[in-house]
Regions:
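Short, flexible, solvent-exposed loop/turn segments with mixed acidic/basic and small polar residues
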Residues: 41-45
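Short, well-ordered, aromatic-rich surface patches in folded extracellular/luminal domains
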Residues: 1-23, 47-61, 68-136
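Short, flexible N-terminal segments of the mature chain
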Residues: 19-40
Length: 136
């Protein structure tokens, strides 16, 4: 049984001031959703700015979503790599944790996994996100 999924999406390319670079979204079976955004600082600033928003949804809703990953999206059959060579653009890594301690990862760049658009919409529909998360 899936206990948690994490979507980490990273923007590559030239660094610019005030630019979002990473979105990290975690959804747990107990209904916790954490959305972390890393972005560059102002033009004179060094380092990254870290924004963390947390949301709580019903455990039943969270469990139904996590169960749908296998039943509706076939996530357990995804290959480990959907990548295509790119120099700029987004890359993503999905980490899936199971109750038996196993961890499964898939990553990609340009090519979305099967049902990727529908999965993105399902995640975005789980909570009233303050900032729209990058999912893929």
């Amino acid at each position: 049984m899936i206990t948690e999924i994490r979507f980490e999406t990273t923007e590559s390319g030239v660094l610019r001031p005030n630019q979002e670079r990473v979105h990290d979204v975690r959804i747990t079976r107990d209904g916790q959703i954490v959305h972390v955004i890393l972005s560059t600082k102002e033009a004179a600033g060094r380092g990254m700015r870290h924004i963390r928003d947390e949301y709580q949804i019903g455990p039943g809703t969270a469990a139904a979503f996590l169960d749908s990953l296998t039943a509706d999206f076939g996530i357990d059959e995804w290959p480990m790599d959907f990548g295509s060579p790119v120099l700029e653009g987004r890359t993503y890594e999905i980490t899936i944790r199971h109750d038996d301690g196993t961890v499964r990862r898939s990553r990609g760049t340009v090519d979305l996994p099967p049902g990727g658009e529908a999965l993105r919409n399902a995640v975005i529909g789980l909570a009233a996100f303050k900032r729209k998360p990058w999912i893929f």
